[in-house]
């Protein structure tokens, strides 16, 4: 059986009218209850208004003890419950004030941001005053760089944390703050790509970039820690520490290699992309034909379904692709690259996306076109 009680309360501290509705033998799902010592509806409402996460309240037992319904979800659900508790919802009721000669300038809503700790990690609380409080949060948090969530509790571990749900326009590419494994902030470069087919955004976090003229500084495999200017994302000489790469990779599912991204943007001539589940570039220690999602070298390409590339990474060699051995070993991406002119054994060939050994370089490959050409490695999801 339902019983409805509607009335208006005027609080001196708020100068705002609220209509409170009671429904007997109901319970709220989607909130946690916080007990108080209040035993009157008015005092319970006042207590609730001071807490931004309070969306309703209940009073139970013979002494009518007040409990606050705390929730940050979009909407709460009312369900049947047998017992001695009454659930109370409230909403603003300015109409009552107007009927009694009030003016719009006289009404001041309670700023719960001043009376409760709502946002974390230095997030800025902004009160909101929805008419339907039960189905709309009473606050928003402006999160500082590196955090997200409705209360700024979630550290952003990769560029993926800055992407909103499907259908939204992607963020602008550029430098963003993310958090490492110790929740320490650092800057990275993010590239966001809107996928037209799925209407989703893929985010890419840059972990390494260098000019061809700086190739000797980037001979270490990814499983060795060899940071370069790790606090200053740049295209000429940059590499994150291994620990930060691992932290980003935990929030990633794929990787890619690009050429001259700083000048040409995303160009899929001389481009390679793979899945972490098939090739983990942070642990890969071999030289073999490996599955990739896509590879294009000088216009020759293959895509997902039947696509392999000869990938090399060892303790004395950085991660890269050998297009000569890809053809020699009959990988599915078997276009023939040049053999190294300085290699008497004939086993090594054209380096793509890294290493660039003297005599193993093809200037038609965009990454090694000239001394200022750049090579990038990214982790994405």
What is the predicted function of each stretch?
Residues 2, 99-381:
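Mature extracellular or lumenal effector domains of secreted proteins
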Residues 2-113, 117, 128-140, 144-146:
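Extracellular disulfide-rich cysteine clusters
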């Amino acid at each position: 059986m339902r019983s409805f009680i509607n009335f208006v309360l005027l609080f001196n501290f708020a100068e705002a009218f609220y209509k409170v509705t009671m429904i007997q033998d109901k319970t709220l799902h989607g909130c946690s209850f916080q007990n108080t010592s209040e035993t009157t509806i008015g005092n319970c409402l006042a207590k609730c208004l001071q807490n931004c996460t309070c969306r309703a309240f209940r009073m139970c037992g013979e002494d009518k003890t007040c409990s606050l319904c705390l929730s940050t979800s979009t909407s709460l659900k009312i369900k049947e419950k047998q017992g001695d508790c009454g659930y109370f919802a409230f909403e603003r009721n300015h109409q009552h004030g107007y009927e009694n000669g009030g003016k719009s300038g006289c009404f001041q809503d309670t700023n719960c941001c001043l009376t409760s700790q709502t946002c974390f990690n230095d997030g800025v609380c902004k009160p909101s005053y929805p008419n339907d409080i039960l189905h709309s949060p009473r606050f928003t948090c402006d999160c500082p760089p590196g955090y997200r969530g409705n209360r700024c509790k979630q550290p952003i571990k990769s560029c993926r944390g800055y992407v909103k749900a499907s259908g939204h326009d992607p963020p602008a590419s550029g430098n963003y703050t993310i958090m490492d494994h110790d929740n320490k902030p650092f800057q990275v470069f993010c590239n966001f790509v809107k996928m037209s087919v799925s209407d989703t955004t893929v985010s890419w976090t840059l972990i390494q970039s260098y000019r061809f003229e700086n190739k000797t500084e980037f001979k270490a495999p990814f499983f060795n820690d060899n940071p370069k200017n790790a606090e200053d994302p740049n295209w000429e000489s940059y590499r994150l520490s291994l620990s930060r790469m691992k932290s980003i990779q935990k929030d990633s599912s794929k990787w890619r290699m690009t050429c001259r991204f700083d000048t040409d943007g995303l160009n899929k001539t001389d481009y390679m992309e793979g899945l972490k589940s098939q090739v983990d570039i942070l642990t890969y220690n071999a030289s073999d034909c490996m599955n990739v999602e896509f590879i294009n070298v000088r216009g020759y390409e293959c895509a997902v379904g039947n696509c392999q590339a000869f990938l090399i990474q060892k303790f004395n060699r950085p991660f890269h692709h050998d297009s000569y051995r890809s053809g020699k070993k009959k990988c599915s991406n078997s276009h023939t690259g040049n053999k190294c002119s300085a290699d008497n054994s004939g086993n090594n060939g054209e380096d793509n996306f890294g290493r660039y050994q003297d005599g193993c370089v093809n200037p038609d490959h965009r990454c090694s076109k000239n001394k200022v050409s750049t090579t990038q490695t990214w982790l994405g999801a």
